């Protein structure tokens, strides 16, 4: 009887160990809504390659950075560089790719090109009517992102409009900006180039059309980095480290390019 019980205990322990080994540790990411397309593409490719699940919580750049600090995720996602005060807290940023910030209008808007200076004047309220920039008579409706958005931070930094923009509507995601602009003939907004759809029109900036090629060669001025955020002195789990190594490797370059961004490596 004792021998039978011992064999049963060994069998149970063996089965438990096998179940534990069969489960891959998941990887959690949190942050920028603009990075959804590229991070979802990379996560899918990594899962097919390794069987490890990668979760993505689209909360915005600022919230993603806070999630890393609080230990709520493995890797944070930011569509802007880390600030000095964030680095001082022990955070480290690794550039994954570069993305253009498209200036978008309603498809029916006949304006197709704006200078960086004109864009700044529009968003600060100095220019208020489309007829003043070659469009139809209509009050310009300014759509932007919420405070702590990496896209907003990048846009305002490049156009030198920090704390000066006269937003009519502040959206909490890239998709919401696109929806708002597509439904209003007088609206203007900004959004990740990788996320822009046919429901809106991306205008040229100083004569340069936003594209992967013009972001890569630097001729398109309105661009920013996509950054992976980690704690400098905290070791990632084995699965998270493997995911980090994969998405920053040359092996993932084609996947990133397919998602509409310019890989940093």
Feature map (PLM): residue ranges:
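C-terminal motif of bacterial Sec signal peptides marking the signal peptidase cleavage site
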Residues: 16-20
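Exported/periplasmic ABC-transporter solute-binding proteins
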Residues: 4, 22-265
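Positively charged n-region of N-terminal signal peptides that target proteins for export
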Residues: 1-9
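Conserved functional loop/turn residues at catalytic and ligand-binding sites
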Residues: 8, 12, 72
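Lipid-exposed faces of alpha-helical membrane segments in multi-pass integral membrane proteins
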Residues: 11-14, 203
């Amino acid at each position: 009887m004792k021998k039978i019980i011992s064999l049963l205990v060994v069998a149970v322990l063996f089965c438990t160990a096998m179940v534990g080994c069969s489960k891959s540790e998941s990887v959690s990411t949190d942050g920028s809504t603009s990075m959804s397309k590229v991070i979802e593409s990379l996560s899918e490719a990594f899962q097919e390659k390794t069987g490890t699940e990668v979760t993505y919580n689209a909360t915005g750049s600022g919230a993603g950075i806070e999630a890393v600090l609080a230990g709520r995720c493995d890797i944070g996602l930011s569509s802007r560089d880390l600030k000095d005060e964030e680095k001082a807290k022990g955070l480290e940023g690794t550039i994954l790719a570069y993305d253009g910030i498209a200036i978008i209008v309603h498809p029916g808007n006949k304006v197709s090109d704006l200078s960086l200076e004109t864009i700044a004047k529009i968003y600060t309220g100095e220019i208020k009517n489309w007829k003043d920039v070659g469009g139809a008579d209509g009050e310009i409706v300014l759509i932007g992102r919420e405070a702590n958005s990496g896209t907003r931070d990048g846009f305002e930094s490049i156009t030198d409009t920090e704390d000066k923009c006269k937003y009519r509507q502040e959206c909490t995601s890239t998709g919401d900006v696109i929806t708002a602009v597509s439904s209003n003939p007088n609206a203007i907004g900004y959004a990740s180039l990788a996320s822009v759809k046919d429901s809106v029109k991306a205008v040229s900036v100083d004569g340069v059309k936003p594209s992967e090629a013009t972001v890569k060669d630097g001729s398109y001025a309105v661009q920013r980095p996509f950054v992976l955020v980690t704690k400098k002195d905290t070791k990632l789990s084995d699965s998270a480290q493997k995911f980090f190594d994969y998405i920053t490797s040359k092996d993932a370059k084609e996947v990133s390019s397919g998602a509409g961004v310019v890989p940093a490596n």
